[in-house]
């Protein structure tokens, strides 16, 4: 086994404001009562403004490859995405097996309503008119057949292809680290050059693109509907900039099938979204492979990169989140180096 490099991430949950920390989050609202999941292989298409045309055909979303492998194609539509909620009663839009690959699309925020031409006033209205609801458009849920509570879901990011445009904004006087500075808010739309993998933020200011999903997570164990904003033991809105193609997420499973979502797609991000947002985009292709890991339970998510492991901690109290991240790091080191937790803590120093 080679050297281990550790990066710890902490998330602070506070009420309604973006604050210091790698990921800064809104307060978790209470659950909305909901029924048990309907674990059917299809989802009824009921797009507003169109007549119902019947259930989507699962077989028409699956491509069989040589060697017995399967690739599932999941477009982002109003029928395959949710706006701002995780809900473990949501009917799965796709059913796959452990080891399968999924090629999925994602939307821009608020069901593709934040696109070039949308004003900051309109963006503010999308936030203030729907209290408790997150801004993220989430593709899913995806039901993984073998996944059961107590298992771990391993999600490997194979490839990410963004759209050619993106945005950065902060809502007037409400969120981010600068609400008093930008009381009128601001929105900026950007062209993403996918050949050079850069964007010109300002004349002469070029930002390299490093796309990653800001949100990827599974259903909570508690029934009900929850905002997409806070992360937690189910992963979710982690906003970890190192979660790029070539890395792997390990997340505990809490409900049968795991129920996997992804969205909040980023083209690039600093180490924290201090003005509220990163370079927000949508993905033409988010290519992932899912595997179910049995007999190796986790209590919090981890990310494996080609050169490091990332551990996490989540709490409303930043100090408690930091303590969780430290404990998770010591736990990982003790597992991989077969040393005591006490020696692992010394090694961390």
Please name every model-derived segment.
Residues 211-237, 241-319:
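Conserved mixed alpha/beta catalytic, RNA-binding, or beta-rich assembly cores of soluble enzyme
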Residues 136, 159-244:
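Intrinsically disordered, low-complexity linker/loop segments enriched in Gly/Pro
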Residues 4-25:
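Gram-negative bacterial Sec-dependent N-terminal signal peptides
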Residues 57-130:
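N-terminal, Lys/Arg-enriched amphipathic/low-complexity engagement segments
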Residues 109-120, 160-170, 257-267:
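Short, Lys/Arg- and Gly-enriched loop/turn segments at beta-strand edges
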Residues 28-80:
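N-terminal pre-domain segments of enzymes
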Residues 77-87, 131-139, 226-234:
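Short, structured beta-strand/loop micro-motifs enriched in basic residues and often containing a Trp
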């Amino acid at each position: 086994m080679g050297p281990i490099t550790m990066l710890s991430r902490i998330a602070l949950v506070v009420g309604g404001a973006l604050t210091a920390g790698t990921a800064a989050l809104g307060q978790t609202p209470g659950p909305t009562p909901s029924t048990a999941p309907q674990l059917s292989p299809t989802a009824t298409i009921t797009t507003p403004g169109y007549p119902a045309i019947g259930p989507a055909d699962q077989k028409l979303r699956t491509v069989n490859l040589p060697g017995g492998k399967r690739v599932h194609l999941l477009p982002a539509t109003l029928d395959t995405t949710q706006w701002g909620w995780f809900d473990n009663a949501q009917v799965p839009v796709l059913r796959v097996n452990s080891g399968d690959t999924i090629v999925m699309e994602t939307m821009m925020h608020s069901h593709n309503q934040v696109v070039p031409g949308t004003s900051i006033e309109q963006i503010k209205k999308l936030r203030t008119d729907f209290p408790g609801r997150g801004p993220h458009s989430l593709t899913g849920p995806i039901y993984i057949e073998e996944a059961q509570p107590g298992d771990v879901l391993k999600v490997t990011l194979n490839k990410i292809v963004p759209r050619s445009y993106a945005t950065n904004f902060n809502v007037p006087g409400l969120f981010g680290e600068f609400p008093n500075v930008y009381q009128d808010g601001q929105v900026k739309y950007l062209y993403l050059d996918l050949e050079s993998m850069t964007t010109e933020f300002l004349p002469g200011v070029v930002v390299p693109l490093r796309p990653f999903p800001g949100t990827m997570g599974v259903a909570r164990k508690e029934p009900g509907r929850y905002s997409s904003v806070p992360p937690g033991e189910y992963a979710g809105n982690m906003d970890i900039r190192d979660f790029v193609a070539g890395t792997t997420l390990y997340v505990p499973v809490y409900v049968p099938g795991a129920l996997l979502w992804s969205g909040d797609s980023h083209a690039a991000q600093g180490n924290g979204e201090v003005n509220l947002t990163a370079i927000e985009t949508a993905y033409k292709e988010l290519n992932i492979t899912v595997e179910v890991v049995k007999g190796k339970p986790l209590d919090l998510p981890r990310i494996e990169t080609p050169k490091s492991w990332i551990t996490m901690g989540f709490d409303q109290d930043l100090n408690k989140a930091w303590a969780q991240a430290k404990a998770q790091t010591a736990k990982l080191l003790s597992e991989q180096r077969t040393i005591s937790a006490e020696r692992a803590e010394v090694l961390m120093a």
